[in-house]
Swiss-Prot record:
Taxonomic source organism: Sinorhizobium medicae (strain WSM419) (Ensifer medicae)
Protein name as catalogued: Phospho-N-acetylmuramoyl-pentapeptide-transferase
GO biological process: cell division; cell wall organization; peptidoglycan biosynthetic process; regulation of cell shape
Gene Ontology annotations for the cellular component aspect, listed alphabetically: plasma membrane
One function term, GO molecular function aspect: UDP-N-acetylmuramoyl-L-alanyl-D-glutamyl-meso-2,6-diaminopimelyl-D-alanyl-D-alanine:undecaprenyl-phosphate transferase activity
Residue intervals passing through the bilayer: 27-47, 71-91, 93-113, 138-158, 174-194, 205-225, 245-265, 268-288, 297-317, 343-363
Cofactor: Mg(2+)
Documented EC number(s): 2.7.8.13
Record keyword Ribosomal protein present: no
CDD domains linked: GT_MraY (cd06852)
Compartment(s) of residence: Cell inner membrane
Amino acid sequence: MLIWLVELADHFQFFNLFRYITFRTGAALFTSALIVFLFGPAMIASLRIRQGKGQPIRADGPQTHFKKAGTPTMGGLMILAGIVVSSLLWADLSSIYVVSTLLVTLGFGAIGFYDDYLKVTKQSDKGFSGKARLGIEFVIASIAVFFMMQAALSAGAAGSTFGSSVTFPFFKDLMLNLGYFFVLFGGFVIVGAGNSVNLTDGLDGLAIVPVMIASAAFGLIAYLAGNAVFANYLQIHFVPGTGELAVILGAVIGAGLGFLWFNAPPAAIFMGDTGSLALGGLIGTVAVATKHEIVMVIIGGLFVMETLSVIIQVFWFKRTGHRVFLMAPIHHHFEKKGWTESQVVIRFWIIAVILAMVGLSTLKLR
């Protein structure tokens, strides 16, 4: 919204700064962090009163988790407030990529909010029907992908079929045109990203820091992919307009820093599905927009690992009656093996940093 002040630059030279994505990204980060810091305490107090017993604790979980009983959830509301308000202020709202990303973020956040509401009111870990939830997520994601695909096709970026194509790391010219099946592929990527972050969010601070790390990595990717000069130098595909997504990702980092202040152990609040689904969906949408869906598997490798541990556990148990892990997702497995919560969290953060660096290295290895 504030980018429109550039029109006043002839009279007020300061407004020239609003042209630059880097300036607006930094401003979005600061704004979202400030929003969460200022309104976080009041929101936590309100949620604690309204929820009473807070988020239900799994009966079969690690014994150390029972001391967390009574901690309020739905902290994703403060994260979403920071991201959305900051993005509305600093991002270019005429960009279909910005609008699509905010659509997914708010849509997934609403689904997560309803899921959290059911869990809190029923005091059960069984919330929204899994099939119904996935179906609605897929519809929202597919709509966003369709509009982003049309935008890329209309721009004629890197060829007339680029918008409907999948690109591959390490190969600068290799693309697979899926046609309108790309909508299904992109929808799957976004839904998968949302639910992967959701599965990771099981310990204080475990999900939010890797989300910020992935956001920083994809913020750089979005900026480079949206800049013709940098994209040509790195020999990555130029996607006009995606640079604006760096502003939203800056807002994610700021909101994440603000939330971590309250989510640091012992957590005063959990983000809940409200936050984890929204954040994962946001990152997935950026990956689709910038044509780095496969690179997301590397950068978000921690989330992939958590998801695979659940899939393997369920599949093997149904097939043999035995479990591969002591408990899934895998962060609980390490808790059961004797790791303290802080050891699991910090070691997983380290893994997230390493994977982000490996993912970013693919930009040059072509």
